[in-house]
Swiss-Prot record:
The lineage of its organism: Bacteria, Pseudomonadati, Pseudomonadota, Betaproteobacteria, Burkholderiales. HAMAP family: Ribosomal_uL2_B (MF_01320_B). Transmembrane segments: none annotated. GO terms for molecular function: rRNA binding; structural constituent of ribosome; transferase activity. Part of the 50S ribosomal subunit. Forms a bridge to the 30S subunit in the 70S ribosome. Keywords: Ribonucleoprotein, Ribosomal protein, RNA-binding, rRNA-binding. It comes from Acidovorax ebreus (strain TPSY). This is Large ribosomal subunit protein uL2. InterPro entries: NA-bd_OB-fold, Rib_uL2_dom2, Ribosomal_uL2, Ribosomal_uL2_bac/org-type, Ribosomal_uL2_C, Ribosomal_uL2_CS, Ribosomal_uL2_dom3, Ribosomal_uL2_RNA-bd_dom. Belongs to the universal ribosomal protein uL2 family. One of the primary rRNA binding proteins. Required for association of the 30S and 50S subunits to form the 70S ribosome, for tRNA binding and peptide bond formation. It has been suggested to have peptidyltransferase activity; this is somewhat controversial. Makes several contacts with the 16S rRNA in the 70S ribosome. Pfam families: Ribosomal_L2, Ribosomal_L2_C. GO terms for cellular component: large ribosomal subunit.
Amino acid sequence: MAVIKIKPTSPGQRGTVKISRDHLYKGEAFAGLLEPQFQKAGRNNNGHITTRHKGGGHKHHYRVVDFRRNKDAIPAKVERIEYDPNRTAHIALVCYADGERRYIIAPRNLEVGATIVSGSEAPIRVGNTLPIRNIPVGSTIHCIELKPGAGAQIARSAGTSATLLAREGVYAQVRMRSGEVRKIHIECRATIGEVANEEHSLRQLGKAGVKRWMGIRPTVRGVAMNPIDHPHGGGEGRTGEGRHAVDPWGNLTKGYRTRNNKRTQVMIVSRRKK
């Protein structure tokens, strides 16, 4: 992949940095793995806004990605690497020996024509999926399950990965990209390697319109609103919040932890780095 810096021929082009997609498949996505994706614009069934700053954006289909990788001992050939508008990572279309096709998250250095396989007897090779108990300590992994058979939930975005640190009893210790070390059951599956499109973090959108293409609407500061619209609103001219930072409903937004899942707290060996 290559980084493309756009010439500053206009204010919208100035500072724009794109990621080359020359190595990706140029045709249409595989129709058998597409599903319609309807615009909700952040509204619920009553039409009320439940998530702000959503709406508009380019229409696209959802690509059904296989996060379980549960076709064991059946080799699959990589037919093509594709762009996916629903995620930062690229996806790979693989064809199994029995003729079934599935999309998977494309690992780095996975090439068209390569063969991948899942299962406990799979070799340690990029793109292969195994239970954590069969993966050597120190390996770089991605698409990690939190519950056996539930499908990958960790390290799925572009350029991400985790490191298998140790195994103790029925749990393994995995260090995330954030620095957090977490216990994961050894029967959970993970894929060897790291996710492709690692240069995604170098992308610069260049103009506000690109965010609108992505379906993201503007965010207005509370201090720029009227008092009826936000607790920070009002005042003559430019004024500060006048209080601790809160959201539009008066809830504190800075300086305290919001995680409340105490049930899985024991699975965290060390917290992430700030």
